[in-house]
Every structure is written in structure tokens, then in C-alpha cells.
């Protein structure tokens, strides 16, 4: 089960993993999306009035984009935390959207956790995947998704927590998405001179100036490499057309580093027992490694 903050997050950091597990005959995948991404940019000129500061209709539109992404990745079980529209995109930290009464950032943590626990107890996954405590790059909704997922990992097994949401279930492992330092360095070397405003490397003097969390390569505990799903990931990215311009940074990165950038995804085991692995530094090549079924 993968828990993401907004539509499009599922493909950027976990599209390869989602597609590979969705295609495997003996596994199933559930994607939980916490908000509709109402505060996102609109990169399609004719759709500019969907923006939150105009018609405020972007969230509904992005439901359709998410459906297209899921179709490209082979995901057949996608759910919204608390139902579509229960919690709203909080925007970047320090913006007025943080204070919206329905923002995920302002959500009661126990209530939001109970909604994820409801899904966990229904699906009974062996693995949970979300972000690190910084949300990868400090976005309030990513931080909240981490908090909710970390608590649900423990609380789903507690019969005293949220009675009436199903039978208790102990998830075996919890992972956090990770950006290896070596990958960030490669991106910086290629793109720090780019003027694309969606390019996180633009104008930086050093890779350490990035807002995102970088993980030393030796601390990565799992990697999913499935180049056969590279095209599916790119197709899923294209489905999010309001968020990713086809001539913008994300696709330039795909062309520049290709499968080194988008064909391998990295994770850190945050809870549970590490399984066997034969990847670099003994990394697991399967998030289900060592799990007893």
C-alpha cells in the first residue's frame, strides 16, 4: 500500500514500484491519495481558470488525471483518504492555504490516522510506503502523509484504536521514499544551469542547497529496478498534464538521465525487519523480501 499526498506524487517517486507490483501475478497494490491537489499549478494555458485563486476547480480535474496515471501504471485500487475532498491540499509551507479549515495540514492527526487504519484493515497489506519525516522536501501534506502512515503502521494492529474500522492488522514493514545523494549529484551536474522554473537544481551552487532530503547511498535499504516499466512511468507522468509540461524539467530529466533517473526507485526501511537483498550495499530488490505470507 502506497500513501501519497497529491495526484502525481504516486508516479514521481514510486511509479516503477507501483507498476511492477501491479503487474506481478501474486501481488496486489493499493494507492491512497490524501488530497485532490487543489493548490497545484496549472501549466496548461487553456485550463488556467481551474486554479485555486480563480475558479478553484483543479481538484476535480486532477481526479481525472490521477485515473489516467493509474491506468498507465496498472493500478486498479485507488482510494482517497477519508473519501474524495475530505482533506484539501495545504499548499506550500507558509502560504494562506495552510490555514484552510479542510487543509490536510490542519487535520486532526487521530482522525486522519483512523481513516488510513480503516483502509489498512480492509486491504490488509504487508507493506506500507510513504515519505520521510520531512515529507521529502518539506511540503506540509507530505509531512502529514508521513505522520499518518507512521501512526497507522502501529495503530492498525491495536484493537483499542478506532473500533468499528475493521479487525486489527499488523503490517510487516514500512518504507520511506528516498533520494540517493548520487542521483541528486547527477541531476545537479546536468541541470543546474537550466532556467526551467520547475527545475529544483536551477540557480543552486551546490547539491546540498536542494530543499529535498538527500540520503547517503549506503543508507538506502531497498531499490526497485524494473526498466520494462519505464515507458509506463512516463505515460503516467504525461497523464498529469496540468502539473508536468511535456517540454519541462521532468521530461528533460527523463531524456537526460533516462532510466537512471526514472527507471530505478529507492527506499529506506523505517519499521519492520529487513529482508535479504543482493543489490548494492546489500539492498533489497523487493519490498516484500523476508515477509512471511
From Swiss-Prot:
A GO MF annotation of the entry reads: N-acetylglucosaminylinositol deacetylase activity
The residues listed in the UniProt record as binding Zn(2+), with positions renumbered to this chain, are 6, 9, 142
Q: Where is the signal peptide?
A: none
Q: Give, as one word, the top-level EC class.
A: hydrolase
Reaction(s) the record says it catalyses: 1D-myo-inositol 2-acetamido-2-deoxy-alpha-D-glucopyranoside + H2O = 1D-myo-inositol 2-amino-2-deoxy-alpha-D-glucopyranoside + acetate
Where is the organism placed in the taxonomic lineage, from the top? Answer: Bacteria, Bacillati, Actinomycetota, Actinomycetes, Frankiales
Q: Which Gene3D superfamilies match?
A: LmbE-like (3.40.50.10320)
Q: Which organism is it from?
A: Frankia alni (strain DSM 45986 / CECT 9034 / ACN14a)
Name the Enzyme Commission number(s) assigned to this protein.
Answer: 3.5.1.103
Entry-linked Pfam families: PIG-L (PF02585)
Q: Which cofactor does it need?
A: Zn(2+)
Name the domain of life this protein comes from.
Bacteria
**NCBIfam families from the UniProt entry:** mycothiol_MshB (TIGR03445)
Q: Which UniProt keywords apply?
A: Hydrolase, Metal-binding, Zinc
Recorded protein name is 1D-myo-inositol 2-acetamido-2-deoxy-alpha-D-glucopyranoside deacetylase 2
What is its biological role?
Catalyzes the deacetylation of 1D-myo-inositol 2-acetamido-2-deoxy-alpha-D-glucopyranoside (GlcNAc-Ins) in the mycothiol biosynthesis pathway.
Q: Which InterPro entries match?
A: GlcNAc_PI_deacetylase-related, LmbE-like_dom_sf, Mycothiol_biosynthesis_MshB
| Entry's Gene Ontology BP terms | mycothiol biosynthetic process
Instruction: Write out the similarity annotation.
Output: Belongs to the MshB deacetylase family.
Q: How is the cofactor bound?
A: Binds 1 zinc ion per subunit.
Amino acid at each position: 500500500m502506497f500513501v501519497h499526498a497529491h495526484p502525481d506524487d504516486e508516479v514521481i517517486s514510486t511509479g516503477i514500484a507501483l507498476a511492477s507490483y501491479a503487474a506481478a501475478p501474486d501481488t496486489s497494490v493499493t494507492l491512497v491519495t490524501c488530497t485532490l491537489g487543489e493548490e497545484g499549478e496549472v501549466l496548461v494555458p487553456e485550463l488556467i481558470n481551474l486554479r485555486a485563486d480563480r475558479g478553484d476547480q483543479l481538484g476535480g480535474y486532477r481526479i481525472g488525471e490521477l485515473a489516467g496515471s493509474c491506468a498507465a501504471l496498472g493500478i486498479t485500487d485507488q482510494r482517497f483518504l477519508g473519501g474524495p475532498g475530505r482533506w484539501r491540499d495545504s499548499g506550500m509551507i507558509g502560504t494562506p492555504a495552510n490555514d484552510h479549515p479542510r487543509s490536510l495540514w490542519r487535520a486532526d492527526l487521530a482522525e486522519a490516522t483512523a481513516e488510513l487504519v480503516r483502509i489498512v484493515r480492509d486491504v490488509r497489506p504487508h507493506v506500507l510506503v510513504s515519505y520521510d519525516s520531512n515529507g521529502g522536501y518539506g511540503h506540509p501534506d507530505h509531512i502529514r502523509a508521513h505522520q499518518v502512515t507512521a501512526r497507522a503502521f502501529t495503530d492498525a494492529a491495536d484493537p483499542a484504536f478506532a473500533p468499528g474500522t475493521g479487525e486489527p492488522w499488523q503490517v510487516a514493514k514500512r518504507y520511506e521514499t528516498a533520494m540517493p545523494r548520487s542521483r541528486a549529484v547527477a541531476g545537479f551536474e546536468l541541470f543546474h544551469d537550466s532556467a526551467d522554473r520547475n527545475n529544483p537544481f536551477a540557480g543552486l551552487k551546490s547539491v546540498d542547497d536542494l530543499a529535498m532530503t538527500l540520503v547517503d547511498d549506503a543508507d538506502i535499504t531497498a531499490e526497485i529496478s524494473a526498466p520494462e516499466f519505464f515507458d509506463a512511468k512516463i505515460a503516467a507522468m504525461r497523464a498529469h498534464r496540468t502539473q508536468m509540461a511535456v517540454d519541462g524539467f521532468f521530461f528533460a530529466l527523463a531524456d537526460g538521465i533516462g532510466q537512471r533517473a526514472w527507471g530505478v526507485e529507492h527506499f529506506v526501511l523505517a519499521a519492520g525487519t529487513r529482508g535479504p537483498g543482493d543489490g548494492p550495499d546489500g539492498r533489497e530488490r523487493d519490498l516484500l523480501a523476508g515477509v512471511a505470507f
